[in-house]
Amino acid sequence: MIKKELGRSGIQVPALTFGGNVFGWTVDEATSFSLLDALVANQLNFIDTADVYSSWAAGNKGGESETVIGNWLKKSGKREQVIIATKVGKPMGAGKQGLSPRYIRQAVEDSLRRLQTDYIDLYQSHDDDRDTPLTETLAAFDELIKAGKVRAIGASNYQADRLVEALQVSEQNGLARYDTLQPEYNLYAREGYEKALEAVAQQHGLGVINFFSLASGFLTGKYRSVKDIGKSQRGDTIVTRYLNPRGLRILAALDQMADKYRTTPAQISLAWLIARPSITAPIVSATSLQQLDELVGATRLQLQAADIRALDEASRVG
């Protein structure tokens, strides 16, 4: 498995990041443990989660994903074999959100307790917090790194101008800097990242671990008509957003490439992302070992330059 560095952090990660939002939500603990064991066995040992996962599920309040991962770490004893990324900032109850130093200090202790570890490899701002000065937020993160509780920090859902400002604040004040960026990016949703964020990431040497890599499942080819709405709880939203002339054009190109490489649209979509020079490790999830095997296959797939250009053209906006 080829490894890439997360920004300038010195942390080496595989070609894909596993999205831990499924833990405590769409897979039970036993299945989660099987998936985590299989990830390590296949060298896909970079796991991304967040304190807020999976608060949206009935009966949950947040922290479920971290708890499952922590239980697995305790049972397996494989802490040194995995890279754990989590996030802070989303609402976790009354007065528990944002990026104030007080809350960051509280939230990191909660995450460490749930994960049953004494350090987090990558600690990320889940959202920008414009109510807290960047200097205060970054100073709090810097404190965590110096204390050995966090190895590196990253930003998720930041706009380009604010990301640049944060990087400047770090440099001017001698504080830890964001080494990673987590934006939405896939073969369909390209403009938001490519228009401004990509240049910032490349100029400042940031590692990019993008989410919605398969456009909520649309790029797997699962949703091709309004009749497919019932295939998942998110079917209505997916069909409404992606099922249009451009989306169908992308699916047609993926089908053509899948036939050529004797693989699946999902693997082609991920291979396209992996081939992007600015992308470090796209985030993608699985709920079964069969789906996980498909992810592993994507890391071995190398698209020809002409085919990458064909996918670029098929997904062009406008």
Residue ranges of model-derived segments:
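Beta/alpha (TIM)-barrel catalytic core signal, keyed to glycine-rich beta->alpha loops juxtaposed to Asp/Glu
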Residues: T132-G318
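Active-site mouth loops of central-metabolism enzymes
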Residues: G20-A30, P91-R102, D131
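A short acidic, helix-capping loop that chelates divalent metal ions and anchors anionic groups
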Residues: Y53-A58, P91-K96, E294
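Short, acidic/polar
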Residues: D28-L39, L99-R114, L163-Q168
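N-terminal binding-site loop/beta-alpha segment at the start of enzyme catalytic domains
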Residues: M1-Q81, K146
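Active-site groove signature of glycoside hydrolases
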Residues: L112-D131
